[in-house]
Amino acid sequence: MDAAHFVHTTFLGYLWCFTRLFIKSPSGRKRFNVLGALNAVTLEIITFTNESYVNAESVCELMRKLAASGLGILITIICDNARYQKCAIVFEVAEELGITFLYLPSYSPHLNLIERLWKFVRKECLYSKYYADFNSFRTAISSLIETAHIDKYKELKSLMSWKFQSFKKVKFLGV
């Protein structure tokens, strides 16, 4: 589980030209927040979205959606150490729904598969694309997230591999 905050502005993928190029850009004042949970086996994504803030209530709402999805198995959520994931209300709702948390070490987004998904969404929806209004921006992101596990399955399957780099016989230096 992780949150992504998509800002309605221009993201340039790559640009190399010898002449001056003017690119349209929206104001960048609106933000589309997506709190998501990724099923690492089926690559299905369950999300909670808003335009204000991601907080403990958002996490509780996402956990309720996860529990209502009817997986029929114990749910363990792997998450980073965001403050809103460690509130008392979040623990109460998790206990009520039978959900457990597994926290990743600090500063290790490379271990969270959903971070790769957010990078994929940015590449597909935002890089070198212009959205005149916020509704089209939000719709593009939402529709990709909702259908990615079907339409972009091959790309996601290679991106969401469980192969993580490991280091053997590494010496750590103390300072």
Regions found by a protein language model. Name each.
Residues 1-60, 64, 160-162, 167-175:
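Extended, low-complexity cationic-aromatic segments
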Residues 10, 47, 88-89, 120:
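Short, function-defining helix-loop hinge/capping sites that tune catalysis or transport
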Residues 13-16, 91-94, 116-117:
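Short, glycine/charged-enriched secondary-structure capping and boundary segments
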Residues 21-27, 97-113, 130:
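RNase H-like polynucleotidyl transferase catalytic core
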Residues 51-55, 109, 129:
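Pocket-edge positions in alpha/beta enzyme catalytic cores
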Residues 58-102:
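RNase H-like DDE/DDD metal-dependent nuclease/strand-transfer catalytic core used by mobile genetic elements
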Residues 79-81, 88, 103-124, 135-137:
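RNase H-like two-metal-ion nuclease catalytic core shared by retroviral integrases
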Residues 115-175:
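C-terminal anion-handling pockets and recognition modules
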